[in-house]
Regions:
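Short glycine-dipeptide loop
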Residues: 69-70, 150-155
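Class I S-adenosyl-L-methionine
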Residues: 163-207
């Protein structure tokens, strides 16, 4: 029975991998963002989008489809990730560490972003508590950046491993946005502790 469940999960993951390859996306993670977007309507034509931890690029590819030619895309990741990515039309790719990057570098000439995305996950150690703590630190930094660069009314999506501070971080999103939702996409592994926390309608930096 256990082997059958493992086989089912492997087939399921492979199905999304093959679908992404067939449709020209850089990774199966694209279907997580697609499902989130279908549930909450993240994007509008012409939006300015910041993707934190953007490699290998499937979320930027999906965002491009949603915001159209007039939209602006900015992606940030570590050098090893950026260097391995294929060129993305109309996207500005920045090489750097999300924990130390300067906000001015992210914004460039823009007054702000309409959507901030983060599919960042830590390099897992296999130690559950350590991985949760690292995920929480990445999520907290992504939220901090979103609070600094989002325009009023903007949206945020961040991946978070469920851990001791999960509720506290969700409350931080509730205080920052008009609406907060959590989504566990169908393309996520059933045994995964990841959740996507969504903030809709940024209240503004002074609220």
């Amino acid at each position: 029975m256990a082997k059958n469940r493992l086989d089912d999960r492997g087939t399921r993951r492979d199905r999304f991998h093959q679908k992404a390859k067939k449709e020209g996306f850089a990774a199966r993670a694209v279907y997580k963002l697609e499902e989130i977007d279908q549930k909450v309507s993240l994007f509008e034509t012409g939006d300015r989008v910041l993707d934190l931890g953007c490699a290998p690029g499937s979320w930027l590819q999906y965002a491009r489809q949603q915001v159209g030619e007039t939209g602006i895309l900015v992606g940030l990741d570590r050098p090893v990730g950026i260097n391995a990515m294929k060129a993305l039309p109309h996207a500005r790719l920045l090489s750097g560490d999300v924990m130390t990057v300067k906000l001015e570098e992210l914004k460039g000439e823009l007054s702000g972003f309409d959507v901030v995305l983060s599919d960042m996950a830590p390099d897992t150690s296999g130690i559950r508590s350590l991985d949760q703590s690292r995920s929480e630190a990445l999520f907290e930094r992504a939220l901090e950046i979103a609070q600094a660069v989002l325009s009023p009314g903007g949206n945020f999506v961040g991946k978070l491993f469920q851990g001791p501070d999960f509720k506290k971080l969700m409350e931080a999103v509730r205080l920052t946005f008009d609406k907060m939702k959590t989504v566990k996409p169908a393309s996520s592994r059933q045994i995964s502790i990841e959740q996507y926390v969504v903030g809709l309608g940024f209240k503004g930096a002074n609220k």
